[in-house]
Curated annotation (Swiss-Prot):
Pfam families: Ribosomal_L3. One of its GO terms (cellular component) is cytosolic large ribosomal subunit. Part of the 50S ribosomal subunit. Forms a cluster with proteins L14 and L19. InterPro entries: Ribosomal_uL3, Ribosomal_uL3_bac/org-type, Ribosomal_uL3_CS, Transl_B-barrel_sf. PANTHER family: 50S RIBOSOMAL PROTEIN L3 (PTHR11229), LARGE RIBOSOMAL SUBUNIT PROTEIN UL3C (PTHR11229:SF16). This is Large ribosomal subunit protein uL3. Keywords: Methylation, Ribonucleoprotein, Ribosomal protein, RNA-binding, rRNA-binding. The gene is rplC. It comes from Burkholderia vietnamiensis (strain G4 / LMG 22486) (Burkholderia cepacia (strain R1808)). NCBIfam families: L3_bact. Belongs to the universal ribosomal protein uL3 family.
Amino acid sequence: MMSLGLVGRKVGMTRIFTAEGDSIPVTVLDVSDNRVTQIKTVETDGYTAVQVAFGSRRASRVTKPLAGHLAKAGVEAGEILKEFRIDAAKAAELSNGAVVGADLFEVGQKVDVQGVSIGKGYAGTIKRYNFSSGRATHGNSRSHNVPGSIGMAQDPGRVFPGKRMTGHLGDVTVTVQNLEIARIDAERKLLLVKGAIPGAKGGKVFVTPAVKTKGAK
């Protein structure tokens, strides 16, 4: 599914109240200053897409090739460039320098949000995979946080790939699907998305229309 999306910054979490008094936990996303830097077409690039810049970056931190690319579009450098595959009809409605705002979405719409999860560093199997710990007492000595056996015998004589073991936890790309847009603050260019999304405060996220809306609650 080819749809235009937005690049945003995770501001944090709060809650809002419905007219009936129900409390809804929401994540606030700043989606200001999404500006088009390039329109790709089948004729020039072999496919149709739009490239969007988000945030700001000092000119001294921009490479010369990128500076030339942005100057051609007539936009200032951003922290991040993101490409969205779209159809030709939608691409024809956009132009270099155009600003894509929060009004791209509507209240109640289902969206997919992609971000980088918070890094936890090196973690054991209890924290990483919710393994059970060893017994605290009753003869157990220095085996409280061990994963247990990781293999079998001389046959097969190896540890199978994918075996859940200790290692780095977090700091991976995570996509949460079918989140609902609870409120849109067009004046402050904010999206309030129901529920939690990956990443720490200040992290960059990508918001796109949901691709698996059938049967979504």
